[in-house]
From Swiss-Prot:
It comes from the Bacteria. This is UPF0181 protein KPN78578_22920. InterPro entries: UPF0181. Transmembrane segments: none annotated. Belongs to the UPF0181 family. It comes from Klebsiella pneumoniae subsp. pneumoniae (strain ATCC 700721 / MGH 78578).
Length: 61
């Protein structure tokens, strides 16, 4: 699977981590917090994108 991911600066990454921690402090699960922040980043990011390939480990088993 290929996915276009935002290319973030270190500062942007730090802000994303802080946002995830804020959401978790409000009682949201870590997975849900990560998903929400990822969705926010994809919706608002205007910089470069990187392409990542994710392999399904269960494939061919």
């Amino acid at each position: 699977m290929f996915a276009g991911l935002p290319s973030l600066s270190h500062e942007q990454q730090q802000k994303a981590v802080e946002r995830i921690h804020e959401l978790m402090a409000q009682g949201i699960s870590s997975g849900q917090a990560i998903a929400l922040v990822a969705e926010e980043l994809r919706a608002t990011h205007t910089g470069e994108q990187i392409v990542a390939r994710f392999e399904d480990e269960d494939e061919d088993e």
